[in-house]
């Protein structure tokens, strides 16, 4: 039985962005539930996270991933979380539940799964008003709840480079749904009590600025709470333009994903590092190719090894160093670090440091920056 949040271990809480959502510094990620983890595993992970003081859980309508896995089914992760919430009704008011609407994806099983039976032929995932509202309603059904606390847009409707792509291609696609239409749909969902706040994901500085402009025109800028983008020792792109955009557009909080570079920065894929047959890059070779040991660039692998050696030199684990670095970033003051795992020992180890403030002395930070300067964002290169 999970501890109530009143008796859970201490964890720093903060408002997410400028919203009224009060969230823990760590957020439980769920993307493996339904592929690498089953209902029993998920229940145990939620209970353990709550014992650590976590009140924030992130999922998505397209989860689990990878979508090419034999067991994949759109919405399965939300159903697993919904089953837990249905059996732990008292926990619902203690927890902040975030999910994500899928961005542009042609002929998608994710969009088809919004209806029962699934729509055939499969429609496109888009961020037009009708699609956003249908996605939210489907998520509410699967989650067995009357509201989503944070509804995020998994990626934009317009074309942007995504998930390892690094170069914007002019005029690759120009049939985008206007941001204003999507913003109005989110306002309608908030007015109906179906969502409390909304967020972006895998966005660009241009997108953040346009979203802020659209929300200000609608009077809903205080509802734009967060942005969920990749951030880690091997992907620090957020440090520059996005950090400025989020700061100047009302203080949008960051929810960094893959803070361990898909597990590469944990050190478990080094020789003797403890990777098993169920580890992500062993079970699904070439998934997240920019971080997979078999396909990552030599620069990425070298930088990861440098960070692992630095962790050894300062007497900590590679995972603790990687997570501590992210926690020390100022733009995390109004955000939350997404932490996921496939086994309880791994999750317990990754959540344990959150009981204390993150501390890295100046020498360690200087050493991290020295590695970064030698190999700047290696997983984001051509």
Predicted regions and their residues:
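Short, acidic/polar
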Residues: 37-50, 128-142, 183-184, 208-212
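Glycine-rich, aromatic-flanked loop segments that form ligand/cofactor-binding clefts
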Residues: 89-110, 251-263
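Active-site gating/metal-coordination segments in enzymes
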Residues: 108-152, 160, 230, 234
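N-terminal binding-site loop/beta-alpha segment at the start of enzyme catalytic domains
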Residues: 2-100, 130, 146, 277
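Structural preference for beta-strand elements that scaffold enzyme active sites
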Residues: 15, 23-27, 55-56, 94-100, ...
